[in-house]
């Protein structure tokens, strides 16, 4: 029974990887289960043996994004004690993830979720809120609290900048690198943290 469970897990993973690959294509056409099944050379019924719905497939992608990003951020905040370095690291992680996972970027900005189950967009919004909360937490621990600096406002500003970079990347057909000129960008963004 363990071998069958392993094969099922592998098939689920293959379906999710194929869906992510299809999302990397610049076409803005809605991905149907028929197109996904055709790409995998299986029947639609075979897809539904592994996922109850297409929404569940997207949930699988969102779970991967969430686990990856929050895991990387947890590791980073454990390794770096300086809150400014933590903020810089988090922003870099968010941009690098998009660069390496182009199809996932379309999920992160909600583009791939248009006309899908509304709970998927809600789930992505919750992830954005969690990422912003991570930034806010780092900003709260800055030395001296940086009088006059509002961690909530700064975290929102940084997150809006990241989401803007994700949008530019996706809307350019993945031509405009979200992490382009990162050092120069951080030099400017980091000024917001100076007293």
Segment roles from a protein language model:
Residues 60, 74-100, 146-158:
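Hydrophobic alpha-helical connector segments
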Residues 1-26, 30-39, 56-59, 68:
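Basic, helix-initiating cap at the start of DNA-binding domains
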Residues 96-100, 137, 155-176, 188-195:
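Amphipathic C-terminal alpha-helical segment
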């Amino acid at each position: 029974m363990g071998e069958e469970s392993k094969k099922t897990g592998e098939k689920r993973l293959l379906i999710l990887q194929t869906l992510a690959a299809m999302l990397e294509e610049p076409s803005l056409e809605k991905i149907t289960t028929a197109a996904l099944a055709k790409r995998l050379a299986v029947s639609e019924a075979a897809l539904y043996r592994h996922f109850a719905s297409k929404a569940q497939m997207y949930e699988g992608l969102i779970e991967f994004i969430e686990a990856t990003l929050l895991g990387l951020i947890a590791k980073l905040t454990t390794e770096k004690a300086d809150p400014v370095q933590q903020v810089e690291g988090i922003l870099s992680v968010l941009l690098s993830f998009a660069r390496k996972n182009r199809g996932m970027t379309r999920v992160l900005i909600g583009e791939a979720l248009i006309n899908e189950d509304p709970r998927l967009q809600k789930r992505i919004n919750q992830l954005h809120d969690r990422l912003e909360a991570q930034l806010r937490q780092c900003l709260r621990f800055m030395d001296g609290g940086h009088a006059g600096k509002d961690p909530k406002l700064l975290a929102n500003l940084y997150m809006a900048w990241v989401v803007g970079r994700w949008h530019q990347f996706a809307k350019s057909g993945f031509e405009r690198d979200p992490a382009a000129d990162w050092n120069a960008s951080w030099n400017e963004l980091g000024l917001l943290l100076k007293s």
